[in-house]
């Protein structure tokens, strides 16, 4: 296997909070998959949840080398956790097509947050 992409993003959680205060749930609906939306609505700290998901999706877009454009959208990257809570990505629509075109075999996600920041790194292997 070879690393074919690496992306990192850091988000100031208060920035996400300000956007949600200003525009309601518009940001969350644009970023989250339907399953993530359900978790967001029930989460004890929804702003922190949203900030972490945003960081992962930005990192994924960077790792793929595309950014969010040309048919690629935030909600096509879905953060899911295994039985131990380890995050990974489930890809949908154009994101899944792009992964197939690139020969992606594995996606690795690491996620961290502190009081003010959420940070994520995504590694793509072929």
UniProtKB/Swiss-Prot annotation:
Coiled coil: none
Function: Transfers the 4'-phosphopantetheine moiety from coenzyme A to a Ser of acyl-carrier-protein.
Gene: acpS
A Pfam family it matches: ACPS
Catalytic reaction list: apo-[ACP] + CoA = holo-[ACP] + adenosine 3',5'-bisphosphate + H(+)
Cofactor section: Mg(2+)
Entry GO CC: cytoplasm
UniProt similarity note: Belongs to the P-Pant transferase superfamily. AcpS family.
Record's keyword terms, sorted: Cytoplasm, Fatty acid biosynthesis, Fatty acid metabolism, Lipid biosynthesis, Lipid metabolism, Magnesium, Metal-binding, Transferase
Sequence positions that bind Mg(2+): 9, 58
Enzyme Commission identifier(s): 2.7.8.7
Locations listed in the record: Cytoplasm
Protein name: Holo-[acyl-carrier-protein] synthase
Gene Ontology process terms (BP): fatty acid biosynthetic process
Main location (coarse class): cytoplasm
Source species of the chain: Yersinia enterocolitica serotype O:8 / biotype 1B (strain NCTC 13174 / 8081)
One Gene Ontology MF term: magnesium ion binding
């Amino acid at each position: 296997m070879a690393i074919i992409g690496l992306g990192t993003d850091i988000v100031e959680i208060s920035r996400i909070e300000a956007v949600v205060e200003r525009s309601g749930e518009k940001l969350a609906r644009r970023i989250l998959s339907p399953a993530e939306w359900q978790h967001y609505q029930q989460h004890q700290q929804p702003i922190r949840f949203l900030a972490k998901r945003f960081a992962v999706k930005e990192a994924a877009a960077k790792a793929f080398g595309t950014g969010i454009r040309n048919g690629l959208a935030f909600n096509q990257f879905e953060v899911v956790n295994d039985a131990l809570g380890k995050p990974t990505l489930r890809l949908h629509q154009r994101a899944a097509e792009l992964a197939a075109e690139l020969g992606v075999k594995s996606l690795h996600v690491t996620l961290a947050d502190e009081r003010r920041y959420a940070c994520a790194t995504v590694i793509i292997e072929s």
